[in-house]
Design a protein with these regions (language model features):
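Divalent cation-coordinating acidic motifs and surrounding scaffolds
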Residues: 2-257
Length: 257
């Protein structure tokens, strides 16, 4: 676990109504089962080689740009519109890490194909895809797309938070990242929690999210730079009120909506 070094500033940017929160919470109360956390299927994770292709003049970025993007019903139908898919790919290229919600495709070639569109201009992105979450026909997948030239992911530390009591509709996807630097021992590390709350039960799920956060900060890696990001299904005021009630302070944030 590394602290923020003097040369790097993390700029947290939420897209389309996503918000980012950060704090350290107290002990977990046991309602979410951390012992049954599920790893994301490794068969769905590409890019086993974590070494980025760099020029000899590689310079670590001074800023990491992290975004959240809820793409409603992101499937083959939507991606068949070339204009839409080109815009989505172009947006993602502007960031170092993008948390995606709303993937609804059972075609295992869908996400790799989207990745190829992101990289068709020479970009070097990879992704981590979580399992199907939700109930019955109301299911989706979460993903992280990231620029492997600026960040790397610990795939062994990626998991979906288990919810044995079914308190949250879409179980969050958690991933541990590290900024790529010339000295890996001083690199900034951080954990992202990709969430989409049920708009019908937002109040109840916001309460559950407090427990989810506690599980994540209590992980064995003891990473204390933890960010919640995604679609919280509430407006800024509602989210800030919730955060304040648990002692969580929102970060500086921008939205496109």
């Amino acid at each position: 676990m590394q602290k923020l070094s003097s040369w790097i500033l993390v700029s947290l940017i939420a897209l389309l109504g996503g918000y980012l929160l950060r704090d350290r919470l107290g002990p977990f109360d046991g309602n979410i089962d951390s012992n049954s956390q599920q790893k994301s299927p490794q068969s769905l994770a590409i890019g086993g080689d974590h070494q980025a292709v760099r020029s000899k003049a590689f310079t670590p970025p001074e800023t990491l740009r992290i975004a959240s993007f809820h793409i409603t019903a992101f499937n083959a139908n939507k991606s068949s519109n070339q204009k839409i898919i080109d815009i989505l790919a172009r947006v993602i290229r502007n960031f170092d890490v993008v948390a995606i919600q709303g993937i609804q495709s059972h075609d295992q070639t869908f996400v790799p194909h989207f990745l190829s569109l992101i990289n068709n201009d020479g970009a070097q992105f990879e992704y981590e895809l979580g399992p199907q979450v939700g109930r019955n026909t109301n299911q989706q997948q979460f993903a992280f797309f990231f620029d492997k030239q600026t960040v790397e992911i610990d795939r062994q530390a990626t998991y979906t938070v288990a919810d044995p009591h079914d308190r949250i509709l879409y179980e969050p996807l958690v991933a541990l990242f590290r900024a790529r630097t010339l000295n890996s021992e001083t690199a900034f590390t951080f954990k992202l929690v990709n969430v989409h709350l049920d708009p019908i039960n937002t109040s109840e799920e916001l309460s559950t999210l407090h427990d989810v956060y506690s599980v994540v900060v209590a992980d064995v890696d003891q990473e204390d730079d933890v960010l919640l990001l995604g679609n919280f299904s509430t407006d800024t005021n509602g989210l800030f009120d919730w955060g304040n009630s648990f002692g969580i302070q929102p970060t500086h944030q921008h939205t496109t909506a």
